[in-house]
C-alpha cells in the first residue's frame, strides 16, 4: 500500500516550534497551494493545507521559512479522530511532512 503526498506551495503562516510532553519538537506549516485547474473566471483557486512537521524538519523549517516562501513538502496523509462534547466522532486528516524542500534561494 502507498500513502504519499507531495505539495508545492507558498508559506502563509510561519511555523512555531513547540515541545510535546515527551520532549519532541513539532511545528505546523500552513501552505497555500494552487489547484490544478482554472475556475469559471480563468483563475486558479487555492487550498490552504496545514502540514505537521516533527523534530529536525520542524527546526529547519522554522529557521528558513518566510511568509511567501515557495516550498515543497513530501509526506503522508494521516487520519485522526476524537469525540466531540456530545460524544460524536469527529474525523480529520493532516499532512505529516517527512521532508521540506526550500525552492527559492535565500535572497529571493
Tell where the protein language model's regions lie, with residue ranges.
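Single-stranded nucleic acid-binding surfaces, predominantly the OB-fold ssDNA-binding core
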Residues: 1-108
Amino acid at each position: 500500500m502507498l500513502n504519499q503526498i507531495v505539495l508545492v506551495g507558498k508559506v502563509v503562516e510561519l511555523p512555531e516550534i513547540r515541545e510535546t510532553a515527551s520532549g519532541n519538537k513539532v511545528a505546523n506549516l500552513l501552505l497555500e497551494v494552487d489547484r490544478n485547474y482554472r475556475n469559471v473566471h480563468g483563475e486558479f483557486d487555492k487550498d490552504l493545507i496545514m502540514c505537521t512537521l516533527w523534530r529536525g524538519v520542524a527546526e529547519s523549517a522554522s529557521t528558513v521559512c518566510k511568509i511567501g516562501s515557495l516550498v515543497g513538502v513530501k509526506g503522508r496523509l494521516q487520519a485522526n479522530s476524537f469525540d466531540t462534547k456530545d460524544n460524536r466522532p469527529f474525523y480529520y486528516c493532516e499532512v505529516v511532512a517527512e521532508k521540506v524542500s526550500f525552492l527559492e534561494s535565500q535572497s529571493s
